[in-house]
């Protein structure tokens, strides 16, 4: 037969809203804030509110799908297989996506239930003669693999090479329509039956884009967040876990989908704009200059881009800005009690920032310059203030950092302790020190 393999040119706008809608909503927002301004004569509310809401609308536009396949098949032994039966034998495309399985089921083993590497997909029309269609490589987690061709098979056999393999969903397409599929044979069944690979067919995409799957470093951070949300033994050796726990909280509350795991970044991106406004106001004491700072922040491409991906940068940057905000407040304060409160809050946000990513340690150096400049200028209660700073900027961040590990199963057969947190951070340092790997999103 003639087989028409179409690249299915995909419209990047997938039904959430359109740029024209954004302009419409932004106009409504401006009108509403103008009416508030006319009534209350509050310039700050009008300017800042307009900037923040318009930026928020743009930031959340086409953020991600509200659903994606979740239930995952995993074998109980090596070299396990099952057979699917198709409603028609002709098809042109296979889409497959894998997620993480039940790591906790691997009793006593420091391994992870993860990946399609080595899985063989075969086709047959008589259940006796089998043709090899494809042998899958690992590929990134929660990113689709597509196999295109001209196929004619009634039965599909999936052969896993390792008990650590997983498949979340598989779908077969013919001329843009999905082919009906059912399980023909599944000898092992059990807790994770073969039916799990075809139970969410309405959620699988024929032409996936960023909107439908993991993108960039979401393969690390969102994977870890889902492990935390599901109470799974986790693979975490790249960064501290506060930011990951924030994403995990949203997944726990609202379910697992691209929109949900990217939403915390959008919220913190909006908070960054507000924080920039107020730190500018504290520095310049001018509403208009503060608005300029906030607008410049909204126009920064890195700020917008990283806020729309399930990464850690929005959390880290927000906490860094806040630790500087309270240090600037300390610098401009004359009341000693209020000075200490501002130093305490600066230290708390410093602890939060370092608990997201280690690069906040570099940012914290600037706090010391501001602190010592004021101490040298004022020359009052220097020793007493420095002693308080040992508590605020050393002990306090260490305690926050360690407590951020409490919700997480980093240790399979052990529990949280300061010793275990320390050893885990040594492992993270070793990972970054020895890392020499490529990345499929890297610049060339």
List where the protein language model places each region:
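Extracytoplasmic catalytic/substrate-binding loops of multi-pass membrane glycan-assembly enzymes
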Residues: 70, 187-204, 210-222, 234-246, ...
């Amino acid at each position: 037969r003639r087989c028409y393999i179409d690249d299915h040119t995909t419209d990047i706008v997938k039904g959430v809203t359109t740029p024209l809608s954004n302009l419409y909503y932004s106009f409504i927002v401006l009108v509403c804030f103008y009416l508030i301004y006319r009534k209350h004569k509050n310039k700050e509310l009008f300017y800042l509110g307009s900037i923040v809401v318009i930026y928020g609308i743009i930031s959340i536009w086409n953020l991600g799908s509200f659903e994606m396949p979740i239930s995952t098949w995993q074998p109980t032994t090596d070299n396990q297989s099952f057979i699917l039966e198709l409603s028609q034998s002709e098809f042109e495309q296979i889409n497959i996506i894998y997620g993480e399985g039940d790591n906790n089921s691997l009793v006593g083993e420091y391994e992870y239930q993860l990946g399609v590497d080595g899985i063989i997909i075969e086709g047959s029309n008589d259940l006796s003669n089998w043709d090899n269609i494809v042998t899958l490589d690992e590929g990134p987690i929660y990113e689709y693999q597509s196999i295109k061709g001209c196929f004619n098979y009634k039965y599909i056999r999936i052969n896993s090479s390792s008990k650590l393999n997983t498949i979340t969903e598989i779908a077969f397409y013919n001329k843009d329509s999905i082919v009906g599929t059912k399980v023909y044979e599944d000898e092992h069944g059990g807790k994770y039956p073969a039916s799990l690979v075809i139970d969410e067919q309405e959620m699988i995409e024929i032409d996936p884009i960023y909107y439908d799957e993991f993108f960039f470093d979401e393969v690390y951070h969102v994977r870890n967040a889902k492990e935390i949300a599901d109470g799974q033994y986790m693979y975490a050796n790249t960064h501290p876990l506060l930011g990951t726990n924030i994403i995990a909280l949203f997944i726990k509350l609202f379910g697992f989908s691209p929109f949900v795991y990217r939403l915390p970044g959008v919220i913190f991106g909006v908070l960054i704009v507000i924080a920039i406004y107020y730190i500018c106001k504290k520095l310049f004491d001018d509403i208009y200059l503060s608005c300029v700072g906030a607008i410049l922040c909204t126009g920064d491409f890195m700020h917008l881009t990283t806020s729309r991906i399930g990464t850690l940068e929005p959390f880290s940057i927000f906490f860094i800005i806040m630790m500087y905000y309270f240090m600037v407040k300390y610098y401009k304060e004359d009341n000693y009690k209020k000075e200490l409160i501002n130093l305490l809050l600066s230290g708390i946000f410093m602890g939060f920032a370092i608990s997201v990513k280690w690069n906040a340690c570099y940012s914290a150096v600037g706090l010391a310059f501001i602190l010592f400049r004021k101490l040298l200028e004022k020359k009052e209660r220097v020793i007493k203030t420095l002693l308080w700073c040992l508590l605020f900027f050393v002990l306090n961040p260490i305690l926050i950092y360690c407590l951020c590990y409490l919700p997480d199963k980093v240790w399979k057969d052990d529990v949280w302790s300061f010793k275990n947190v320390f050893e885990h951070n040594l492992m993270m340092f070793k990972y970054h020190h020895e890392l020499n790997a490529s990345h499929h999103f890297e610049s060339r």
